[in-house]
Amino acid sequence: MEKPRRLRPRARPQCRGLMKVNLGDFQASILGTHTNARLSGAYPGRPPTFPALETRLTFNKVDLEKNPMEPRQQQFSLWYVLVTILAMLAIQTLFVSGHVETIPYSDFKVLLKAGKLKDVAIGEQAISGTFSTEGIDNLLAKQQIEEIRREAKGDHAFSTLRVADPELVQELEAAKVRFVGQPDNKWLSTILSWVVPAVIFFGIWSFLIKRVGGAAGSMMEIGKSKAKVYMQKETGVTFADVAGIDEAKEELSEIVSFLKDPQRYQRLGGKIPKGVLLVGAPGTGKTLLAKAVAGEAGVPFFSMSGSDFVEMFVGVGAARVRDLFKQAETKAPCIIFIDELDALGKTRALNAVGGNEEREQTLNQLLVEMDGFDSNKGVIIMAATNRPEILDPALLRPGRFDRHVALDRPDLKGREQILKVHVKGVVLAPEVDLTKLAGRTPGFAGADLANLVNEAALLAARKSKQMVEMADFDEALDRIVGGLEKKNRVMNPKEKETIAFHEAGHAIVAEHRPLADRVSKVSIIPRGVAALGYTQQTPTEDRYLLKRSELLDRLDVLLGGRIAEQLIFGDVSTGAQNDLQRATDMARQMITQFGMSDQLGLATYENMPNPLFAGTGLMQRERNEYSESTAQMIDAEVRKLLAEASHRVQATLEGQRTKLDALAQLLLEKEVVDRQDLDMFLSAKVTPMPPPKPVANIEESTATGKPDQKTQGT
């Protein structure tokens, strides 16, 4: 009968970094489940292959780091050396003898001659020993004797520096003092002279090794994408948080629908756009809308700035583009969002002067990746820019960023919706009217409205109010539009009178021009850097077209302040510089761009940028598309428009001289005249009166010589 063979136990292999699994886990690994479902955060957006095994797979943290059967090796640390040195110094301090009195060599000789020395140890540089404290009252200083007797009674230790004294030994022998030779104790200085340089060298060496190792690691990671990944609902933004841009939300809802149900479009043979370009002015909500799309679709969201691609090393930008798209393929369906695309996708230079080889190579790699990208993989590329005119045409062609979503500044209804979103966490007073506030903020983008609400809340908190009132919103609007109010400056009374008539001239002309915007406030309180006063006009509705008659009325309002100064004082000031500049620009646009000149006809005469410098970032030299004689005709037409406006304004102010004087007097008294006060003033019967004498003690800002700036409700 054959003996059963005895099985030898096999040597247990050392398996580092493996999972400790039971039989069920082993079966799961055979089936291909190598990833713990609970660690899916490392691979966001990818569901586990077998959800039923989610609770059965476990990692042994010790096994992942190191085999527990192996002894851990102790690593040498610089702290060991430092602790040892400190311990040695502590031992020396603790076990040293009692207090040692340091005395001059002359006192040592006095004690020797008086026979008070007990024993002496003579070293190379110092002499130490003990002496008797009895009968030394007249030998040492009184303060020193008191200190010695406080320390100890009887014999006391001393120390003194050795002086070249050849008769010292003879004197010690004559005094019958026991003395010995003693070498100096240099062990501490010797240790420090060896250990300290070694410690410094070791520290520098360790620091350099770590820096080199870190640099090597960073060099390996330099080509990796720097995109921030937000998983599913981590963006924290949905379409409910976006208001005032309903058209853009409707346009992007198709993207959300594709990411949620791609088969719906693929079944009919449709393909979702590969790239979506969000175009709009700063603050219109481009980045917010992209996050809302990712939050609605519930997919990973890769966020990266256009400037993050380019580094100081050549080729890094292209490598990061490749790595970004490679990561996106593994996380599909997902969204890649590139903010400030113009930093990366600027038009490639036509010549070698303005070329940027590294940026252009990065752009080329982006074009290649987008061109070879399969739109059915579920990866949507979104980008945002506020300068679409400088983007490379190859980037905007169909097949890349083939869908452009324009985000315009919100209209009246949109501004009201945006305000409702931003005031959700703000305690509002009952009289706050968001519709009225939206009407007073034409041209405000979403970021501007958010800033307005925040400023109003801060002003209310500064005044210790329990809720934000409408007055806080009015003050916040004035701060944003006109700048910080400066009441503490003392202004020359004559200059204050000039500013009052200047602003009154604007207001009177605006009230007598039916097509001009309505005056909402007139103030002679300085604001900001250069505004010594302002006349605020608020349009009653959003306007997208302006007629020639409306532009002429606006010209009249701009010249109202200058003509009022000339009419009242017979002289003009520098305060109208900004008015004249804006009036000249408006008149030139009417002639060169809008075709509103009878002499020049319907042709446009804009200065065109030189295409040689397009997209190079260099200063673009404008070239005229018309002759010198045409330029002279344009200048003549501009002067003609301004002269005609000046005559109309002068006629209006001369006919309303009484109201002009009265409104200026009212401004000198109240400093700020709102719409309610202005209506009462215009409806009241005004008696003619001479120009008012300004009050000298009214606090205002000093004359700066800078032009005043009127807010025209922009």
UniProtKB/Swiss-Prot annotation:
| UniProt cross-references to PROSITE patterns, sorted A to Z | AAA (PS00674)
EC numbers listed for it are 3.4.24.-
Renumbered to this chain, the signal peptide range is none
Chain positions covered by the region annotation Disordered: 688-714
Q: Which UniProt keywords apply?
A: ATP-binding, Cell inner membrane, Cell membrane, Hydrolase, Membrane, Metal-binding, Metalloprotease, Nucleotide-binding, Protease, Transmembrane, Transmembrane helix, Zinc
The protein's required cofactors:
Zn(2+)
EC top class, in one word? hydrolase
Q: Which parts of the chain does the record assign to the membrane side Cytoplasmic?
A: 1-75, 210-714
**Top-level taxon in the UniProt lineage:** Bacteria
Q: Recite the UniProt cofactor note for this protein.
A: Binds 1 zinc ion per subunit.
Per UniProt, subcellular location reads as: Cell inner membrane
**Record Gene3D superfamilies:** 1.10.8.60, 3.30.720.210, P-loop containing nucleotide triphosphate hydrolases, Peptidase M41
Its biological purpose: Acts as a processive, ATP-dependent zinc metallopeptidase for both cytoplasmic and membrane proteins. Plays a role in the quality control of integral membrane proteins.
Q: Specify the protein name.
A: ATP-dependent zinc metalloprotease FtsH
Q: What is the lineage of its organism?
A: Bacteria, Pseudomonadati, Pseudomonadota, Betaproteobacteria, Burkholderiales
